Amino acid sequence: MGGSQLKNLKAALKANGLTGQTNVKKSSKKKGKSPREFDREERQKTIERIREQFNPFDVKTNRNKKVGVMRESAAKLAVGKPGITKQAGEDQRKMFYEAKKSSKNRSGGVLDKRFGEKDKNLTSEEIMLERFTKERQRQSSTKRSLFNLDDSDGGEDENVYGEKLTHYGKSLSLEDDFDEGDLGLQHSDSEDFRLKQAGKRNMADQYGDEGLGDDALQEPARKKTKAEVMQEVIAKSKFYKHERQKAQEKLVQDIEGLDDDFESIMSELRTLPKTKPSQTEISTSTDIAPDYDIKVKELVLEKRAAPADRTKTDEEIKKEYEDKQKELEQKRLDRMNGIFNIEDQKDAGVEDLGEEFWEDSDSEEGEYGEYIKAIPDSDDDVDFEKDNNDDNEYDATSNGRPSARVIPSVPCPQIHDDLLNFLKSYPIEEHPSLVKRIVKTYQPKLAEGNKEKLGKFTAVLLRHILFLAEEDYSVNVKEIASLQNELVSILKTLSEKFTIPLSEDCRNIISDIQTRFKESQFYGLSPSDLVFFSVVGMLFSTSDHYHLVITPCLLLIAEFLEQIRFNSLQKLIFGSILVRIAIQYQRISKRYIPELTYFLQTSLRSLIPSTKGETLENKEKQEDNLSIVGSDINWSKVAPSLELHSLFSEDLEKQESIKLSVLVNNLESIDWCITNIWKDLTAFPEIINPFKDILNVAAEVYPGTSKPKQLVEKIEKLLKFQERLPLTLQQHKPLAIPSNTPKFEENFNPDKKSYDPDKTRSELNKMKAQLKKERKFTMKEIRKDTRFEARQGIEEKKKEYADYHSKMARIVNQISTEEGAEKNKYEREKKLRNTKR
């Protein structure tokens, strides 16, 4: 079909006689029906056929995949119109939606029409009484008359089915409730009551009071009518309500009367003279007060007896200790592998402090004597070992005579300057004892606020240790070293109790070190920074996967080892000590640090002189004159340890022994890394090959030492067992190509879906397939209904919003019109007034 869509449509309409010349003059002789004149139905069918031809997407043909090639022409193809079907479904859904919307809140609801259900002013008795009254009225007017023509027969307390009505297990019979005369009712309105009273008076006048016996006075019992019963019930209810109202009014009046008399009573009480206590009463009270205070203090200081635990055997104690060690080791391994138990973490601090940090805190003995013993132990108390001798240090001298210097009060320094001012008047040997005395004096159990003071003092003590590292102590090295060790021991004990303030101060120190390094590079660092890294490694866990103090320290050490240009002996010593600290950090977790490998290679190339086969890199390193030249070196006297106090000495470059110590120290570091960390890595050959070449040169240059040769032999031995295999794909068992003989069905039927000989199983599978199909269709319809309801809801909301806005606009326009009219009216009146003037 060529041409445009419009031309084709016109041609099709013209070919079917639907368009063309229509004003041709018809012959009057020809009265038969023209072949071009169609009925309305035929015309509509033709239009539908043309519409389908020009709208192929409105028709969908479903082909049967099971129909063979030979039967394809004979098969009838299923033709559907999805557009029309969809529109019909939309119309049907809209009809159901409108019906559901119209019946909303109109059917299926339960309306509580019980009397007094939501009335808060009625009591439960009044509600039940009124319900009973209405029920009896309803029964008497409707159902009762259906079964009994005489309403007066039978009991009034029975319902239409002959059942007696009860309330709380008691009969609802009203015959005797109103004969006792306790209601105070006015019966003058009742005609029967007046006749009864008149009859009684006449009989009394005729026979006298004595002549009437009980039998004569008593009239035969007459059953009350329903109107009388209802009247008495209502009267009784009103009577009780009136009594309650009277009681409430009386209570309110009494309260108001007391309020009115309150001021007069108080004024009379104020006019009374005040009596002073006698001297005897004062003396007795003063005599009792001291005894009372003594008793209170005794009760405060009296230690309450705790229940004694069963004495454990040695096996139980040993087992508990082993279990505790296993638990702590498992926790450490979890932290090292980055496994954190969020539920068990109580604080978001540096470490998760458990109960083991706060148990077994015994009371201290010191300058407070028995008073401290009597105070219960606190969880935050700090316990030092071997403190008994330290407490008596200030009480007597070495020869047994009393000491002339006694410390009456010990301050708790909160900044480092205060601690220096306190310690400057005492010799260095007494500083640890003074620090212990400060800690014991300000135990948290002694006063409120001591815990915060000791937390700050812990950070001050760390600052003091770093301050000692900055001082020049080349003269008294042993005394300063002993002092630092004792202070570090005290700091470690304090760190177990005051971890959070100590960790915060450590992070501040780390930030300060990094700032100084960024500003001045290596020259902004100091020996105290090395001491800080070393002390931190002893205070905190270095094997954790992430730690708030250790992890920043490791990053800072790696930054120093990578960015500092090690072109002087002073820098090499600094880097060697950093390597030792980093190795100490990784003694348990055994993680690889690439910056450490880089520094060890750089330091060895700087210290070992090159041979004839030197490289360009070795030549550049020789310019710094750091290499150790000489074959007559006494290697047995070379110490691998490096002294921190000699790091910044002036004659450092002249000391060849320090260079030898640095070289031996680096060789020891390489040996430790190979043995504990590098050998287990898959990249061990790539890491160790540069060291192998350098160590071979060192073995040639320094034949007097066997350390380089031993390292080379160890490397070669490890490389033999280090098998390197290229990456390969995963091995799978080869799958054979299936070679099955084609299976033909002799009695093949394309309409038959199953060839199962078991009829029961076949029917069951058929039922399952049908159920699955129906379920799928139902879910599809439910989704369509849900989407349709959502669209309808959106349209309704849009319509509501549009109506609201149009209504508001109409109101605003109306108000504006009225305002304008009033304004014009006012202007006209104003103009008229002005013209009259």
Curated annotation (Swiss-Prot):
Keywords from UniProt, A to Z, are: Nucleus, Ribosome biogenesis, rRNA processing
Q: Name the coiled-coil region(s).
A: none
Which branch of life, at top level? Answer: Eukaryota
What is one GO cellular-component annotation here?
A: small-subunit processome
Principal place where this protein is found? nucleus
Any one Gene Ontology BP term: maturation of SSU-rRNA
**Molecular function GO terms recorded:** snoRNA binding
Annotated stretches, region: Disordered? 1-45, 131-162, 204-228, 373-406, 738-761, 815-837
Check the record and name the InterPro entries matching this protein: Nop14
Q: Where in the cell is it found?
A: Nucleus, Nucleolus
Name the residue ranges with Acidic residues bias. Answer: 150-160, 207-217, 377-394
Biased composition range(s): Basic and acidic residues: 34-45, 743-761, 820-837
Question: Per the similarity annotation, which family is this?
Answer: Belongs to the NOP14 family.
Q: What does this protein do?
A: Involved in nucleolar processing of pre-18S ribosomal RNA. Has a role in the nuclear export of 40S pre-ribosomal subunit to the cytoplasm.
How is the subunit organization of this protein annotated in UniProt? Component of the ribosomal small subunit (SSU) processome.
Q: What is this protein called?
A: Probable nucleolar complex protein 14
